[in-house]
Amino acid sequence: MAAKDVKFGNDARVKMLRGVNVLADAVKVTLGPKGRNVVLDKSFGAPTITKDGVSVAREIELEDKFENMGAQMVKEVASKANDAAGDGTTTATVLAQAIITEGLKAVAAGMNPMDLKRGIDKAVAAAVEELKTLSVPCSDSKAIAQVGTISANSDETVGKLIAEAMDKVGKEGVITVEDGTGLQDELDVVEGMQFDRGYLSPYFINKPETGAVELESPFILLADKKISNIREMLPVLEAVAKAGKPLLIIAEDVEGEALATLVVNTMRGIVKVAAVKAPGFGDRRKAMLQDIATLTGGTVISEEIGMELEKATLEDLGQAKRVVINKDTTTIIDGVGEEAAIQGRVAQIRQQIEEATSDYDREKLQERVAKLAGGVAVIKVGAATEVEMKEKKARVEDALHATRAAVEEGVVAGGGVALIRVASKLADLRGQNEDQNVGIKVALRAMEAPLRQIVLNCGEEPSVVANTVKGGDGNYGYNAATEEYGNMIDMGILDPTKVTRSALQYAASVAGLMITTECMVTDLPKNDAADLGAAGGMGGMGGMGGMM
């Protein structure tokens, strides 16, 4: 086992604080509408330019191991805030630095670290409750656009695009961000349920100009098996032909004789048919077939539950207003499934999301909810260069997370004002002893840090602005973009409550642990020169055998 280097007390805390400051100072220059960019060197390709706090934090590793431990713990704050709310990483880092700096001063002055931590925790718990009372629901498109704009670093077009996307696919719909091809941002919306399986034969195409199959008011046959024998399908085909409607077959596969017969029937105009493979694999395929059945009011023909294809009737088939199939995708528009059944299915999938352990599973389940509940919107980010594209895409993703958080828990006044109001309301909060009171004061003073940093990044004097904002009440604050005072909500400067709450909670959690640290242990660096010397000595000993 390698030898260890151990530091105690003040020596350890000084080193740790130095690491915290290096990371936080690099991250906090990005805060606010006039925050600066940070350039990150990459081992290959062009450097990345970013204004995203967590991207900067993730790049930082320090040579001194004790300092690095401090930096890594604050990096954890940014990552946690990012995971919880998708934004607010810079705010969380600034809060953590402020609490740690003030807290370590109090420890150096002889306060009990455990009581300081209890005081900080008490102040933060009270602050979270206050934030909830200040929170205003965020439901209209205008507020959503404002939140998106602020999170995308005051880019109004991004805010409007996100609001439009949410408007089209609903709060539950999936919104994804992709690289665009032009210079302008674009929004593509797919309504209805779309899955990534195309037609099994190009002979099904009935719209040659678009290369697609379009079926109006079709019946939909869902089968959890391979279909290769046409005899199994004859009763259903005859019933559909009598009804005079087209038929869409979604099965594990349709092959051989069955596929050939369907193609011939379609080309002769006897019955209009199209066949596609079912989406997904294994258990996920079964689940997605069931989703389609719920959406279209049909039944999955599955041998597992004792159903046979030959005995299927028109009642077992689903229906939709329209189906569009191209080479790679199938879209079912306006399924006739009952609303109550669809909502029940959505609630069931939501329960699975709660219990899911892997991010991949959670993401796939979320997609299924969106396909059932709303639709899918794709924001295509346009930019002139690849470097700009990466930077802009990161901003759009941040803005998307922030708007989701805003819809979930509401919004508070932005620009650091909400925390200032919370701190002033908690001015009379007291702990069980004087050391806890100091901890409470440390946390309340730290709540001013985000506003001060935003102002500092504007090139203004933080103390003057902070005192002016403290002198006002309600949503009165400082608009750093225009450098004027006023009502933050009216000026459209909003922060999602969830983002502010998560930033404060994670910052206080890690800061509390660091304030109560008394000892740090790390591996001693290996001394390569000493190792080489030892090897040389051993070689000399080999020669001694000849002397005896």
UniProtKB/Swiss-Prot annotation:
It catalyses: ATP + H2O + a folded polypeptide = ADP + phosphate + an unfolded polypeptide. Disulfide bonds: none annotated. Keywords: ATP-binding, Chaperone, Cytoplasm, Isomerase, Nucleotide-binding. One of its GO terms (biological process) is protein refolding. Its EC number is 5.6.1.7. GO terms for cellular component: cytoplasm. It comes from the Bacteria. One of its GO terms (molecular function) is isomerase activity. It is found in: Cytoplasm. ATP binds at residues 30-33, 51, 87-91, 415, 479-481, 495. InterPro entries: Chaperonin_Cpn60_CS (IPR018370), Cpn60/GroEL (IPR001844), Cpn60/GroEL/TCP-1 (IPR002423), GroEL-like_apical_dom_sf (IPR027409), GROEL-like_equatorial_sf (IPR027413), TCP-1-like_intermed_sf (IPR027410). Belongs to the chaperonin (HSP60) family. Together with its co-chaperonin GroES, plays an essential role in assisting protein folding. The GroEL-GroES system forms a nano-cage that allows encapsulation of the non-native substrate proteins and provides a physical environment optimized to promote and accelerate protein folding. Forms a cylinder of 14 subunits composed of two heptameric rings stacked back-to-back. Interacts with the co-chaperonin GroES. This is Chaperonin GroEL. It comes from Escherichia coli O6:K15:H31 (strain 536 / UPEC). The lineage of its organism: Bacteria, Pseudomonadati, Pseudomonadota, Gammaproteobacteria, Enterobacterales.
